[in-house]
Amino acid sequence: MNFTPTRTPICRKISFASKRGAGSGFGDTNRWKKMADSMESTPLPSVEDRLAVLCPSQELLEYYQKKMANCESENEDLLKKLELYREACEEQHKLEWNLQQREEEIAELQKALSDMQVCLFQEREHVLRLYSENDRLRIRELEDKKKIQNLLALVGPDAGEVTYFHKEPPHRVSILQKTLQAAVACEPSASKADPGVSKRQVRIKDKEGISERHQRDTEMLLLQVEALQAQLGEQTKLSREQVEGLMEDRRIRVEEIQVQHQRNQEKIMELTKSLHHTQELLYESTKDFLQLKFENQNKEKVWMLEKDHLMSKITQYRAQCKKKEDKLGKVVPILHESHHTQNEYIKSLKDKLIQEKKLSNMYQEQCISLEEELARIREEEGVRREIFKDRSNKMGKRLQIMTKRYQALEHRRALEVEGFKTDIKSLRQKLRDLEQMLYKATMNNTHGDQDLAMLCEVRDSNRRAHKIQGELKNLKSKVFGLENALRLC
């Protein structure tokens, strides 16, 4: 945009002065001689002196006042646009900061979820260890009972002694009262019988004891095998769940790494694109600068040629004026005073003309500088607009990615909730089965001590069940807390 008009009031004033000088010029040689002497003798005043002496016309003042008002209005518009761009950039930075905080919170929640899974696996391992310890203690109890029975069979009980044994759950009472009475009754008869018959009975009893011992050993081994198989099944299930959880965590980590890599690639592409754009702008600006410099050099050359041409014309006119002075100096001495006043007037007009030229050059330089500043501001505005569009597109893509990740987390949470519900149902079913078994066992037993023992065991099992239910409630509350946190995110 060029603010310099094609024909300003300065140009009209200069042309008017030149016409006036041309109309009153060539008729008087003395005037031209004094003009040349004044041009050689008069020094060029400073800018402050010229501005102090300058009396611009009303048209010139109105013209430049209008130009300055237009420049100020354009400057205000540009400042408003820059303020809008600044607000948009601040809002974008705020959104980016909030997005980064949400990503950090999601990462922390994922870490907490993985920690909770690890704790759950540890609790399950602890429960399995307790189950295995319980089985081991039961097997050991059976072994101890068998040893006690063997010792009682070898030693023999007293006359009125009755021993009760619990074989395996459900607790069944084994009453050995008849065998003991038979053994007591056989003692006097054995003393009266023959020694051969007693030896046969001893051998038969030994064989029966050995067969019973083998049967007990086989039952104990079968119980151990069943307990080990159950432990192995639980361990395999737990290890499978651990492997699945680790694979799921690995998949999530791989997806996060891929998303981060894609973001880095997009950022690199944007930076390279902006670099190429700035390089192109730099190339264009340097090219324009060199072109303007070359044009200015050509203009300076033309101005120098015009100056030389004008100086040659001035020397010619001086020579002609001297010749005419020599010819006409003797003819018109009366007009010397009028020529002197005219020369002074011409000198003042020339000074004004020079001052106006300097002032016009100064205004032209100011207009050129303002045009350059306006072009620079427009270029910066275009660049910022492109950057804003790119950033808005990136924010839209990031929002889509975050919504997808949130949907995946919601799906995963729903699956985990279903898994917890199924676990709770299975544990409740096991608890009901255990209560039924205990009820049946209590209904089958008739002895008072056995009922008391069964009631104690029922109470212990109820305590354990309440403890497991409390742990399940805590886990459920943690899951609901994580769900609420994810919804808030």
Swiss-Prot record:
Keywords, ordered alphabetically: Coiled coil, Phosphoprotein
Any coiled-coil regions, as ranges: 57-120, 212-487
InterPro entries found in the cross-reference section: CCDC77
Residues modified as Phosphoserine: 38
GO CC terms in record: centrosome
Protein name in the entry: Coiled-coil domain-containing protein 77
Native organism: Mus musculus (Mouse)
Gene name linked to the record: Ccdc77
